[in-house]
Regions:
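Catalytic-site neighborhood detector that most strongly recognizes the C-terminal catalytic loop/helix
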Residues: 53, 146-162
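Conserved tyrosine-mediated DNA breakage-rejoining catalytic core shared by Y-recombinases
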Residues: 32-68
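Active-site/catalytic core of tyrosine-dependent DNA strand-transfer enzymes
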Residues: 62-124
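A short, glycine-centered helix-capping/turn motif at helix boundaries
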Residues: 19-32, 129-130, 150
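Basic, Lys/Arg- and aromatic-enriched nucleic-acid-binding interface segment
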Residues: 1-27
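Short basic/aromatic active-site micro-motif
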Residues: 110-130, 137, 141, 146, ...
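Short, well-structured alpha-helical segments
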Residues: 14-21, 115, 153-157
C-alpha cells in the first residue's frame, strides 16, 4: 500500500497510512489533525488525538510520522487541517483515500486489507511488545486499550483476535 501511494505521489496518504499502522489511529482521527497538533507532536513526540465519542488521548509517534509531519507542514498554513486542502471538505478527502485503497487493493499481498486493518496490526504489535516487557496479558491489553482510546477490555480483545 505504501509503494502504491509513493508511486501515485500521494505523500499525504503515506503519512496517513503510517499514522494508522504505527500509531493506531482511525481514519477519522487522521483527518482531524491540524497543523497545531502536528507541530506539538514534533516537539513532544506524542500526538494529541481527538477520538471517537469526544475521547482524547496521546499516542507516541515514530520517526516516519515525524518526517511525514515535517513534509506536510510545508504545504499547510497555520491552523489548517493537515490532510485536507483549505478548499476541500473532510468527508470528501476521506472518501478519496478509501477509494484509493479499494482501487489499489488487488496489488497488495493481502488483498482484504483495509485501513482499519492497519490499526489491528498495530494493536497486535503493541500487545506483543508489552508482553515481552513483562506485562501480564490483562495489563498488556489494558495498555493497548489506553493507546486506542477506548479503555475497554472487550473491545481490545476484538482487536487482538486472530
Amino acid at each position: 500500500m505504501l509503494d502504491e501511494a509513493d508511486l501515485a505521489k500521494q505523500e499525504d496518504y503515506l503519512v496517513i497510512f503510517a499514522l494508522a499502522r504505527y500509531a493506531g489511529l482511525r481514519l477519522e482521527e487522521c483527518f482531524r489533525i491540524d497543523t497545531n497538533d502536528a507541530q506539538k507532536a514534533l516537539s513532544s513526540g506524542k500526538l494529541f488525538v481527538k477520538g471517537k465519542g469526544g475521547l482524547t488521548r496521546y499516542v507516541p509517534i515514530c520517526e516516519d510520522i515525524k518526517i511525514g509531519f515535517v513534509k506536510m507542514l510545508k504545504h499547510r498554513e497555520r491552523g489548517q487541517k493537515l490532510f485536507v486542502d483549505s478548499d476541500d471538505m473532510t468527508h470528501l478527502a476521506m472518501k478519496r483515500l478509501q477509494n484509493f485503497i479499494i482501487h489499489h487493493r488487488k496489488k497488495f499481498a493481502e488483498r482484504r486489507i483495509t485501513f482499519h486493518g492497519l490499526r489491528h496490526t498495530y494493536a497486535h504489535e503493541q500487545y506483543e511488545k508489552f508482553i515481552k516487557e513483562g506485562c501480564s496479558e490483562y495489563d498488556a491489553r489494558k495498555k493497548v486499550s489506553e493507546l486506542f482510546g477506548h479503555h475497554r477490555d472487550d473491545v481490545t480483545r476484538i482487536y487482538l483476535a486472530e
